[in-house]
Design a protein with these regions (language model features):
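Structural/interface elements that position substrates and couple domains in central-metabolism enzymes
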Residues: 1-184
Length: 184
């Protein structure tokens, strides 16, 4: 399956490399060209046990690539994962990146005839996926939920054991509104 991941921080990069190592074709998007270049050269931008070797392997297998995101990005995937940061200086969640990404996804969904599932892994408060992200996508794509999929899959990764946590999770939590998204 083709998977796009928006964000190459801890959650996005670990998820992308692990999914690629499981045989999926993964493209991770970031707005920082230095991060994109580093990843495409096999140099992870975070430290995690075994991540460098796994990244090297999936790059050789051509199952992983990093690309610069822009307003014209066409994701070419049936599954798009949002893994952007939500921190603020005030200690509360800042949804500015979530909102920007939701507009980009709305444009992609609008121009795509196929079903696209959007899954949120970013740290957000309950209700954000359904109210903020869904609202932006529906308003800007002209499509309603069901014509695209929407889900939430929070990550429980611990620094230092994130690869193992992803590959052998002790729990998986999935919120979804349709069976197609759940199956992906």
């Amino acid at each position: 399956m083709k998977v796009s991941i928006i964000g190459t921080g801890y959650v996005g990069l670990v998820s992308g490399v692990c999914l690629a190592s499981k045989g999926h074709d993964v493209t991770c998007y970031d707005n920082n060209h230095e991060i994109v270049d580093s990843l495409n050269n096999g140099v992870p931008t975070i430290y995690e046990t075994d991540l460098k070797q796994m990244l090297t392997n999936v790059l050789k297998e051509k199952r992983f690539a990093a690309k610069l995101i822009s307003n014209e990005t066409y994701f070419d995937s049936e599954l798009v994962i949002i893994a952007v940061g939500t921190p603020s200086d005030r200690g509360e969640i800042d949804l500015v990146y979530i909102k920007q990404v939701s507009i980009l996804l709305a444009n992609y969904i609008k121009s795509n005839e196929n079903f696209v599932a959007v899954v949120v892994k970013s740290t957000v408060i309950p209700g954000t996926t359904d109210t903020v992200i869904r609202g932006i996508i529906e308003e800007n794509s002209g499509k309603t939920l069901g014509q695209f999929g929407l889900g939430m899959n929070p990550e429980f990764l611990r620094e230092g054991s994130a690869i193992d946590d992803f590959m052998r999770p002790d729990r998986v939590v999935i919120g979804h509104d349709d069976e197609k998204t759940l199956k992906l």
